[in-house]
Amino acid sequence: MQRALARLQDVKLRAGGPHADAFLAYARVLREGYAERLATMGETSDHRDPSTTTHLNVVDRHGNMVALTQTLLSVFGSKVVLPSSGILMNNGIMWFDPRPGSPNSLAPGKRPLTNMSPMIVRRDGKAWFAIGASGGRKILPAVFQISSFLIDHGMSLEDAFHHPRIDASGGDTVSVDPRLVEPVRKALGDAFPTVDTELVVYPTNYACPSSVLRDPNGGMHYGVSDVMSPWSGAVAES
């Protein structure tokens, strides 16, 4: 995620967007990042794997923030519950490549390839927003784009979550939300092989993101969970 956002620093985006230039940059950065990932971090799991990942964000009245992503990987994970805590253990060891000699091979002291991208963004030394998602390899594109909507285009948290996105998390095509305006869709189609992919309840074609944000001016707190998911929710203290 850090590398993907850093690559945007070299791109001058038109004001008032995101316009076609922004989505072209998003698609290029995500495709390059995914290619780098395969070359240096091993193969990823199949996109049809069941989603057993949960992400939560918390902000307290003092502006302290937490972004936490937890995953079981397979349904019920390893099917082992720790007796002292009741926590269900995942079976994330299968993220490793069992074959020796690959970037993601199982070895002592190594961390397996994962998709989780919890992130806290700071502005002027203070936590500004916390964000993350569930949804396998679609997590990074979702978190990346929403973060850019907030950072580069000055959107409100609500507008950023409702804005249509793309997904370039592997494969030969870029998934494009048909709600994107025609100039954006045409520019993407001219540059990359694309496929129209609607935002629906299931499958989660664009991940299941959530975020909390603290307004640095008024100190107000805002939170948004995935607008399509019946499994997302939010709680506020009055």
Predicted feature locations:
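Proteins synthesized as precursors that undergo proteolytic processing into mature forms
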Residues: 1-37, 51-203
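Short, basic/aromatic recognition patches
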Residues: 43-51
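Cofactor-centric catalytic regions
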Residues: 179-238
